[in-house]
Amino acid sequence: LGIAFAGTWFAHKYPERRAQMRLLFDAALSAQTPDNRFDIYSRFLGREERYQFPEPYASHVVGSLDYDRMLSAYRSYKVFLNVNTVTTSPSMMARRVLELVACGTPVVSTPAPSLSRFLGDGIIQVSEPAQAEEAVRALVADPDLRARLVHRGQRELWRAHTYAHRVDTVLSSLGIDHEPTRLPSASVIVSTVRPHRLDHLLDRVAAQRDVDLELLVATHGFEAPDLVARARERGLDRITVVPMPTEAALGDCLNALVERALGEVCSKMDDDDWYGPDYLADLLRAMRYAEADVVGKHCRFVHLAARDLTVLVQEPNEHRYTDFVAGPTLTARREVLRAIPFLSVSRGEDTTFLSRAVDARLRVYAADRFNFVQERSGRPEDHTWTEDDEVFLRGGTPCPPLAWDPERP
C-alpha cells in the first residue's frame, strides 16, 4: 500500500489544521500511483456531517479502524501523513506519530517543535506544497530512503521515548529512588593478527557514542607494547591487551577475552571492518527491545575492495529473529558466551556458537543494516571466511557510493 492518513476532519473548528490537511492531502493526491493509492481512515466515519471529509478527499476514505487494527494498518503503508492541532508546543504531539515510527513507517508532517524534539531528523516536516509533494514522492519510490528515515526516528524512540523512560521521569519527579533505564555496559572483543590494522580498530571503537564500553584486544602472535597508550590518546581509558601465541586457535583467543570482560554484553568486532558511531548503541537497544540473548546483523553492506563495489546482502533478513548474524557483528550477553564458549577452532567459531545457542533455545535477533560495512580485501588470506566476491555478488544488490557510508544514518 502507498500513502495514508488517519484522523478526523473538523469542518467547524481548527482552520489551521484544515489548511495543513489540504497541503498534505493535495501532495498525496499528486504523488499517488495506481499501486500506491492515497487512503484515509476516518475516525468519525458515519457521524455528524461536520466530521466528514469533503471532496476531493471523501472518495479516498476507505473506512474506520479500531485501535488494534489501526496498529496493524500502520505497517502496511509506505508513508503516513500527520497534522498538528497544536503547532507551537515543544511537547504536544500525537502519540500516533511515535507509534508509526516504532512500527517502521515513515511520517511526513507539517511542522511542530515537538516533532524535532522527540524525533530529530527521523521525520520529514514540510510547509510548502512543492516540498510536500517531493517528500511523499521520494518516500513512495525509494525503499532505502524510507529505511534510513525510520531508523533515525527509531533510534530516538529507543534512546529516550519508551514507557520505561517515562516511568523514570515520573519516579525522578516524585523523588523516588530507582534504578534508571540504561543500556547494558559493553566489552568490545577483538582478536587480530595484523598490527597495521590497530589504528583503524582504535578509531572505530573510540567513535562509539552513548555506550559504556571497554576494549579487549588479543594480539595474536605479536606484541603491541604501545597499544594502551595509543588507545588512551583516543579517549579509550579502559583497554586490556592479551598477547596470545601464534599457535592459539581464534576461538581460544576470543574465549580469553570473554573471561576477562567486565561488560554485561560482549561485542565481537573485526579490525578491518567499518563501524559507525551509533553501531554499538543501536545493537544494545535492539537487544533490549527484542529481549534477545544474541544480536547482530544479517542484512548488511559489504565492500568488495578489489572491485571498488559495495553490495547490500541478505536484504530481507533484518528486524527479525534468526539463526544467523555476521561474525564481525556478533554481540551476546556475557553469561551466554561463558556458558557456550567458542570452540577451539580458527574457522567457523562464530557459526558454531550460533548453532549451539539456537540449540539451547536462546533468542538470536538480526537488527538493522546500518552503521556497519563489512570489508572484503579480495585477498583470501586476509579473512577467516574465504568465500570469494562472487558469493556476495550473486546474492547482493549493488549500492551507490554514499549508500553504504557507516556514518549514515
Each model region followed by its residue ranges:
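Nucleotide-sugar donor-binding catalytic core of glycosyltransferases
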Residues: 1-98, 103-115, 120
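A charged, aromatic-enriched C-terminal amphipathic alpha-helix characteristic of glycosyltransferases
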Residues: 144-174
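C-terminal catalytic/acceptor-binding lobe
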Residues: 151, 340-409
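Short, acidic, metal-binding catalytic loop of nucleotide-sugar glycosyltransferases
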Residues: 203-212
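Active-site nucleotide-sugar/metal-binding loop of Leloir-type enzymes
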Residues: 254-265
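Short beta-strand-to-loop acidic/aromatic patch adjacent to the donor-nucleotide binding site
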Residues: 263-274
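Conserved donor NDP-sugar-binding/catalytic core segment of glycosyltransferases
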Residues: 278-309
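A recurrent flexible, glycine/aromatic-enriched loop bordering the glycosyltransferase active site
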Residues: 302, 313-332
